[in-house]
Regions:
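Acidic, polar-rich low-complexity tracts and alpha-helical solenoid repeat scaffolds
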Residues: 1-125
Length: 125
């Protein structure tokens, strides 16, 4: 049945999806699809625990697609990886700060502000 997933099956599907997205990226470089494709690549790397690769994919969006509708999401995911997975709170703080000052309408705004304040030492949990 479809509900029974074998060990490693999800990881294999992630690797397959990664290949597809990387091919899309080659075919549509500079296109509007580039930002969302990079976001998907970053997400897959994040799921696979390849956090440095995820950050590289997200950095592409941050550098080349500042006006993308995915920029706040990209900044937030970058901050979360740096804060929770790589234990780099100072670097994470910079990404949370960008959301706070530049993306007040983001769904990540409130959470980013709270985490920024914690990292800055204003509040403790």
């Amino acid at each position: 049945s479809r509900g029974n997933i074998m060990p490693g099956e999800c990881e294999n599907k992630n690797h397959e999806a990664l290949k597809v997205f990387q091919q899309l990226l080659l075919n549509y470089k500079g296109d509007q699809l580039e930002a969302v494709t990079q976001l998907q690549i970053g997400e897959i790397y994040r799921e696979l625990g390849q956090f440095d690769n995820a950050l590289l994919a997200f950095q592409e969006i941050i550098e080349k697609h500042q006006e993308s509708i995915y920029i706040d999401e990209t900044l937030y995911f970058s901050a979360e990886i740096l804060n929770k997975k790589l234990n780099k709170p100072e670097e994470a703080k910079a990404f949370y700060e960008k959301i706070i000052f530049n993306h007040q309408d983001s769904i990540y705004f409130t959470d980013s502000r709270e985490k920024y304040r914690i990292l800055r030492g204003d509040i403790t949990l």
